[in-house]
């Protein structure tokens, strides 16, 4: 009896540990140093939102992103209050990554708007007056939670899962490849950088959604003619999203907006017992430089 109980206890512990190891964690070994910081003084202030059940936080899965931009000369302040005109005052950039309408992504209401009407109006007015927004919303349910805020800037979020068997990692059709070779990188200061060293050649995403921007927006990551969208990761039904994007940039009043339909590509994470890498830490892509270029454009040093 004791032996049987002990076996059950060990089994439970193994399951718990395996589950914990399988979770996404920040890659704390990823090199976030910047040889030549963009800002050595007068650091732009970034508000990083943590007030809306965000899946990504400054000390959690997005720590590598935060460390990288801080090493580039920015000052990052986390926000745990409702967004308002007063709260946004004094900040140059607002970063929102994977907000939710409920505490957990599996909870009922997770895909409902994470932002109330007053917050959406405050952010819209702030951007119109010269602020810059980086809005990141992954596959379902994150797209649903950010859809109302995105819509206020003319951006449609599909809130599904984007696939492209012809332009993706072999055996992983949701991990999309955007390169100069496959012509899925848009022409924009973000993809060109300030010099040849900053020029983007290839980017990789890690399962996201499709976006449709207003006519004056620029698709940074274009979805090809073979791209499709499904409401669930394993859904049998899918629809074409040819002409959509997985990231786009636009100017709004005096401000600027970048909307990302995939989040992991802007951080560096590990998952599973084998510590599989996901994001900037995966070799063979320019995701790290892309993060820097996005922030350079939002802060204004890229015109």
Language model features with spans:
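Bacterial N-terminal signal peptides
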Residues: 8-19
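Short, surface-exposed patches at the edges or C-terminal ends of soluble domains, predominantly
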Residues: 22-303
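Compositionally biased, intrinsically disordered low-complexity segments enriched
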Residues: 6-9, 25
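N-terminal secretory signal peptides that target proteins for export/translocation
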Residues: 1-5
């Amino acid at each position: 009896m004791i032996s049987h109980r002990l076996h059950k206890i060990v089994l439970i512990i193994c399951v718990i540990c395996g589950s914990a190891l399988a979770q996404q964690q920040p890659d704390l070994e990823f090199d976030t140093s910047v040889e030549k910081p963009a800002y050595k003084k007068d650091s732009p202030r970034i508000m990083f939102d943590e007030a809306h059940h965000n899946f990504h936080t400054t000390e959690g899965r997005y720590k590598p992103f935060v460390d990288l931009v801080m090493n580039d000369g920015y000052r990052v302040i986390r926000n745990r209050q409702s967004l308002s005109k007063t709260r946004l005052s004094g900040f140059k950039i607002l970063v929102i990554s994977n907000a939710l309408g409920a505490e957990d992504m599996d909870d009922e209401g997770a895909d409902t708007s994470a932002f109330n009407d007053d917050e959406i109006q405050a952010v819209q007015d702030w951007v119109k007056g010269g602020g810059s927004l980086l809005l990141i919303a992954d596959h379902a349910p994150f797209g649903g939670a950010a859809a109302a805020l995105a819509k206020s800037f003319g951006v449609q979020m599909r809130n599904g899962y984007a696939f492209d068997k012809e332009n993706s990692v072999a055996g992983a059709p949701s991990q999309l490849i955007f390169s100069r070779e496959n012509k899925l990188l848009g022409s924009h200061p973000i993809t060109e950088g300030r010099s040849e060293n900053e020029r983007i050649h290839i980017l990789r995403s890690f399962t996201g959604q499709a976006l449709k921007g207003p006519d004056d927006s620029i698709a940074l990551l274009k979805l090809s003619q073979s791209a499709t969208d499904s409401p669930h990761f394993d859904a049998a039904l899918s629809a074409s999203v040819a002409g959509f994007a997985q990231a786009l940039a636009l100017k709004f009043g005096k401000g600027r907006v970048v909307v990302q339909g995939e989040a992991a590509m802007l951080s560096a994470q590990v998952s599973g017992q084998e510590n599989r890498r996901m994001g900037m830490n995966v070799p063979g892509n320019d995701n790290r430089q892309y993060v820097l270029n996005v922030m350079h454009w939002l802060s204004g040093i890229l015109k």
